[in-house]
Design a protein with these regions (language model features):
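Mature-chain termini and adjacent capping regions
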Residues: 1-178
């Protein structure tokens, strides 16, 4: 049982950490002003260690953004979020998922992998295990996918099996000449 002060601390810590972690990934959108909702079977927060862990059918939403995972770990140092790690097994698919609807300035994003890691300071998104990232109509698929959000650079790696090659589908933009 979580006592009242522990529950308040958990809620406060969760809101601070999630507002720090979600805004850099999503850039400034109208969703940033919407409430952050967290649903999970269990939550553990250690303010001293800068770690919070949500487990069991985790659903995190804010506006058009949604994270689905079996477990989400948030790590911070000096009250600054450093790492977000989402691990799969959502509805037994084995994959963690992230979606964000399109905005006026940004295309929609859908990502899934066995493990999704985001390093906040360097804006590095890494998908490991059956990695798929859709950015608008473009699709990137591989065993490991690294995306430097600030620089717009993708790096994909194939799996061990020769048939497990990287796969990219890039559609021409309507306003770009062929």
């Amino acid at each position: 049982m979580i006592f009242s002060t522990e529950r308040q601390s958990l809620i406060r810590w969760s809101a601070v950490v999630l507002s720090l972690c979600l805004n850099p990934v999503l850039a400034a959108t109208e969703s940033d002003r919407e409430p952050i909702n967290i649903q999970a079977d269990r939550a553990m927060v250690s303010e001293l260690d800068g770690l919070s862990v949500y487990s069991g059918h985790v659903v995190i939403t804010q506006g058009s953004m949604k994270i689905l995972a079996d477990e989400v770990r948030l790590k911070s140092e000096n009250n600054q979020l450093t790492t977000i790690l989402a691990v799969g097994d959502v509805a037994q698919s084995g994959l963690a998922g992230f979606t964000r609807g399109a905005t006026r300035d940004l295309e929609s994003i859908t990502a899934s992998a066995s493990e999704v890691e985001y390093l906040v300071a360097s804006q590095q998104l890494t998908l490991r295990g059956q990695a798929v990232l859709s950015l608008g109509q473009d699709r990137y698929q591989g065993n490991v996918l690294s995306y430097d959000i600030a620089k717009g650079i993708f790096k994909l790696e194939s799996g061990q099996d020769p048939s497990d090659r990287v796969n990219l589908t890039i559609n021409p933009k309507a306003d770009q000449p062929l």
